[in-house]
Amino acid sequence: MAEKRNIFLVGPMGAGKSTIGRQLAQQLNMDFIDSDAVIEERTGADISWIFDLEGEDGFRKREERIINELTQMQGIVLSTGGGAVLSKENRNYLSARGIVIYLETTVEKQFQRTQRDKKRPLLQDAENPRQVLEDLAKIRNPLYEEIADITLPTDEQNAKIMVNQIVDLIDNMNGLNGTL
């Protein structure tokens, strides 16, 4: 059996990276890792608190170290934070060490999925969260596209359908009949 390649999920907050990632890992018998959860576990603090204490720059430095470490593992499905692609180093780590899947979503759908979520530091204190999402999309969407091997819109699909599509696309990419 061929060695399993890593699968890295990128995209904005609310695109479904964690939900789809968990199901994809289960279906492929791989380990699922959420980079934000690893950061929280290692620091003993949630992302919002890290943002408050260290600012976004401090958080991004932590994130870069974690992404470098995690992308060197084998046989994982990794869900990255929405801003992980802001770092050129992270983009290099992701694109060089696995298959990058950009889970694309509209700002409208993102807003619907995140408006009640209190764990989104970039939206917490925003007067106009929808505008924040639009501004983030302008900066980040081209970066997601730059490193993506596969781009999939997530607005109208449920997670199970998305997982099956991803498995089919990866199979076709690799020509390995279901083996990553």
From Swiss-Prot:
GO biological process, one term: chorismate biosynthetic process
Textual note on the cofactor: Binds 1 Mg(2+) ion per subunit.
Enzyme nomenclature, EC number: 2.7.1.71
UniProt keywords, alphabetically: Amino-acid biosynthesis, Aromatic amino acid biosynthesis, ATP-binding, Cytoplasm, Kinase, Magnesium, Metal-binding, Nucleotide-binding, Transferase
Residues annotated as binding Mg(2+): S18
GO cellular component entries: cytosol
One Pfam family, short name: SKI
Record-listed substrate binding positions: D36, R60, G82, R140
Cofactor(s) annotated in UniProt: Mg(2+)
Associated pathway: Metabolic intermediate biosynthesis; chorismate biosynthesis; chorismate from D-erythrose 4-phosphate and phosphoenolpyruvate: step 5/7
Enzyme class: transferase
Predominant cellular place of this UniProt entry's protein: cytoplasm
CDD domains named among the record's database cross-references: SK (cd00464)
SUPFAM superfamilies: P-loop containing nucleoside triphosphate hydrolases
GO molecular function: ATP binding; magnesium ion binding; shikimate kinase activity
Record keyword Amino-acid biosynthesis present: yes
Binding site for ATP: G14, A15, G16, K17, S18, T19, R120, Q157
Catalytic activity: shikimate + ATP = 3-phosphoshikimate + ADP + H(+)
Subcellular location per the Swiss-Prot or TrEMBL entry: Cytoplasm
Task of the protein: Catalyzes the specific phosphorylation of the 3-hydroxyl group of shikimic acid using ATP as a cosubstrate.
Complex formation: Monomer.
HAMAP family: Shikimate_kinase (MF_00109)
Record-stated family: Belongs to the shikimate kinase family.
Protein name per its UniProtKB record: Shikimate kinase
Source organism: Haemophilus influenzae (strain PittEE)
